[in-house]
Amino acid sequence: MILESVSKEPKGRESVAGRVKGLFNRGRNIQALALSFGLALSLGSNGVRADINTVPLVAPLYHGGDLLQKQLFKGLELSVTTGRDLAIFSVAGMSLDAYILTLPLDAPTKARVIARLSDPFYSIPLGHFLYLFYDRYSRAENRDQFRDYLLSQYSKEQIAPWQHSLFSLEEQVKDNTEPTVEANDRREGMTLNRQLVAMLVTVYDRLFNNDDWALGKKLPEHYRYLGDSPEDLALIADIQPLIINEIGKYVGSLPEGDMRSALELIIEDGKAENAAKVNNKAQAITVTLIDFVRLNVLKAYRQYALPAQRAKAFSAWMQASLKEDPKGLSDFLASWSQRPRAVQITVDGLSQGLMQALVAPNSGPYLKEVLARDAVLSQLSPASAMGRPQHTPKQDFLRQLVKNGVTDQYYLPFFKSLYRRSENGIATGGISSTPTISVRNLPIIKTGAAVSGKGGTGIPNFHFVDRTRDRAYYFFGNDALQLENLAESRGMRTMFDRLNYLKTLNCNAQYDWNAQTSFDALVNLGLGEAIRDFGEQRCLNELSLRAEAEKGLQHSVAAVREQLEAYDRMGAWRLFSRMSLRAKLNEQLNELALLSEQAMPDYLLIYNPWPDHFAHFKGPFSDEIIAPTGELNRLDYWLGRLDKVYRDAGIYPQTLWGMAGDHGLAPVYHTLNPELVLQDALKQRGVELKISKISSDEGEGPKITNNLNPPSLHGVDLVIASTAGGNYMLDFFNSDRGWQVQPLYQELTRFKVREGKALDMVSLFADELQESLDYLVVRQSDCTLDSCSVRLVGYRNGQRRDEMISRESGVIRYQALDAKGAPELLALAQSNPYLAPLSDVQLSAKQQLLELCLGSAKGCSAEQWRSLAAMSPRPDAVVQLAHLYDEDRAGTINLFPKEGFGYNTLVPGRHAGEHYLEKDAFIGFWGETVKPGQRLGPLDNGSLAPTLYQYLTGEQVEVGDNGWGYPSVLSSLN
């Protein structure tokens, strides 16, 4: 049996026809459209747009909005029936039925799947689901290409000193098994083997076996996650034994480690005697896998069907335009081929200060200060410390940089060129949102949405308690699949949502539902440790294929324009010649439309998690991160290859590039668990509290939560959760105004522990943790988007300091509450030891701001506070903490540890805190159109997406409108 399904293209590129509704208002005149867009353009920003004749930015039809967004691709409907009469579908180079026969399926399942392949409603989605998880992810060879590159540039003698736990000169293992790691190396990885694919096929078959859940004739606009309806519960009960059985098979292929241990606990919960257990992990993982399979079936089919629908719509419009206005069509194609493109790169843990220091080690004190503090902090023995990280970082390269510098042409060549050519486009200090944690900051960077308010992400931390649902979330585990659903429920719009009329590509980033082509974030995270360069290889392979198609497309556009000019010159009396040429042009336009969908994207989003991921386990300044064999040079290698693809494709001149990090990282020398300190303090007072810990310690394994039957928090006195070593969040429930209301400072000072007895919980934490605690932050008043007051409590020189930050009507005040002079917890008067000393002009400006903002009761604007804090060790601290509790789910008390301490961690790298090394995030823009007159100053990392959006669309971005939480800085780039 041969399934009729996909493509004539050998590289897996599909061509699919489909219905298109509401394509094009045929009465609309092309030249009128161009004129109207030109008028709109003249009313745009005065910055970049003012010099428009020098910027290949004007795509008057394709990007004017009216044509592409409102007419051409409006109303596209994606249906399964589209693909019923297609060519042969193949997976792994063989027909779908032949591939199914190779999988380790049980005999009844294999027979049933083979028999059902004749049903297109069953087989076509299955084929594209498998294409997503096999061909797309197996297209590249699983070799460490960065390693190969290094060995081609260095001799083994040159590279030998920079070997470390992530890089060895020994020959690589050729298969996909886990590499051997040291006992305290807590990295986790998984492999994409046939057993896993078989499990996914088995789940798919059971879901579709009775046609209870099928795609039908029209794909849904949004995925509906499983709930507690009778139908959903029956489906879960039917699938769960299958899932547990398949997990049992899969566990056998995993090495010993946290991943395997977690799966074995799930199998235990699958036993009949545990069926009624609260937070049953077998049911939890069943729900997660069903949602994962169904969600990715939909994604895979949407990504298969959409390009063909778009191509058909584009072809139909061009053929209609040919008939009505051939010259206008030619002008359109000329403009369209020069349309703007954008590349958005998000790198976990990328710090501007560190990168600038590495490309120019002698330009400032950064690296010397890191090494000097390491020498001091590593030798301290704090009385309150409970231990040290399990791994001691190897920092040989850091020492060489400080002692001798480096003149290695193969070390960070891309970043060196970037700082040399485009330094003004790189912010002097990128600002990470507090707490400086990825789950909070990544959606900010990717979408430009704020955390709170309409259109916000609604995700304040790596964990939170939703009091309205009586539900705790922790996103290292299966709750990660809930992130998109949670953000969407708050109205967050991704760049893919906003640009769904453009050609888009996602490489390894979450929040990708509307991406036209996507490489899954969770797959990359799961496989990228065991198979280095896994996601990067596949993304670059896809782009390389598209670059070749782009060059072919540009040749096709030129050829079609020549034919259009000939057609336009041809007299009306040459009727048959015109008809013949028009028929030929219609065929060429159809081919051009198909080719355009295979060419380079208008918008590309790339996410790279590895600099942060390994910095936690190895240390932020370890050889594993900063050496020539480390993660930052690996990142540099892939950025260089990406740059080359865009240059080879011929579209570099019209491409705006933007890159941001979500935070930096700081080293940990001493570890402490605040809940253990709390328990000892309560025991001494004869008090017991019911405490629920919802997070893993940094370096531990994931947690599984049953979304349909999570543990209730009613009756719990305190919920605790830690984040990345640098933030510790507590939720209390003792407000006089109800369980769902966040308690204020005064309520926490009289926390009832038993009849007639109360504790001052703020003082308890501040006093017991004073050696390790930088400060804690608690609500002084209720917080809204319009106003808030927070109290900071910490110790300095043995004295408790109580300080308050309040904001009202755009004015922020920061003051001491103990009448002991100016506030000092945020160290605004101090200089930043990692940066060059302030000039006389800067010192004068800082003194004026100190007097203005701290010397009077009037307060300052957010911009003034930002300018002041930029000249201190804690960038933007006042503004960030003033907005810490904009989101009600941001906890009751947040603890931030001192430099060198890590709360609830086993590893030597931390973030989520308030120190410069954690707050300093990279954000920068470059490209041939970027020519800022002066360097960008302190800038939120959330400005990345709005700037690229404005460049692509010409639309103004207004903070607070249309879901934007951060401003565009496009006008500052020219």
Describe the residue ranges of each PLM region:
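Bacterial N-terminal signal peptides
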Residues: A32-S42
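Secreted, luminal/periplasmic, and some membrane-associated catalytic domains
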Residues: V58, Y62, D66-Q69, G93-L96, ...
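His/Asp/Glu-rich, glycine-adjacent segments
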Residues: D119-S123, G127-H128, L132-D135, E141, ...
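A long, amphipathic alpha-helix that forms part
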Residues: Y301, S315-W317, S321-S330, S337, ...
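Boundary at the C-terminal end of the N-terminal hydrophobic targeting segment
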Residues: V48-A50
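Low-complexity, glycine/alanine/valine/leucine- and proline-rich hydrophobic stretches
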Residues: K898-R935
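N-terminal secretory signal peptides that target proteins for export/translocation
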Residues: M1-N25
